[in-house]
Amino acid sequence: MEFQHELIIPNEGLPFKVFLFEGGNGNYVREKHWHTSIEIFAVMEGHLEFFMNKEEYPLKAGEQLIINSNEIHSIHAAERNKTVVLQIPLKQFENYFTAQRFIRFRSQDAEADGKLASLIKKLYKVYTARDTGYEFGTMSLFYEIMYMLVKNYRLTEAHEK
C-alpha cells in the first residue's frame, strides 16, 4: 500500500511552519501520510484521534503528540477543535543526529509535555499577533522549543536498544 508524502513548506522567513488546525466542521479525516519533518500537535480545545504504527492515540485539550520524521500517521477529528501544529524540518536538528544521521523524539512526563505544549501555543500566539518585534519573540520561543526537544525528548542510540 502506498502512502501520500506531505511536503512541508515553512512559514515565510522562518525555519518552521506553525498553524491552527480546526478539523473543518467535524468528521475531518486525513488519510495515512508521512513527511520528513517533525510534527507536534498541541490540542487547545476539543479532541482528535491519531493513528500511528497501528496504534490509536486519542488527544484531548491540554495534550500533545510528537510525530517523528517518516512515521506514517492519520488523523480523525469527529468535531471541530483548536489544535496548534508545529512542523520542524529535519535539517534543523542535523547537529544532533545519531550516527545513522537520524533523530527521534519521545513524549516525556506530563509536566514536561505540558510545558512543551504551552510553549507551542505561545509561539503561535506571538507569531499570529505580529506585534512589533514579533520576529524576535517567535524565534526565541522556537529555540526554547528546540532546546527542550533536544535536551529532554531526543532518543539517543542507547535509549533505543
Language-model regions: role of each:
Residues 100-160:
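Amphipathic alpha-helical segments enriched in hydrophobic/aromatic residues interleaved with Lys/Arg
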Residues 88-103:
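Conserved segment of winged-helix/HTH DNA-binding domains
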Residues 1-60, 104:
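Generic protein-terminus/edge-of-domain signal
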Residues 8, 18, 78, 95-99:
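Short, conserved acidic/polar surface loops in the N-terminal third of protein domains
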Residues 59-72:
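Conserved metal-binding segment of the jelly-roll/cupin
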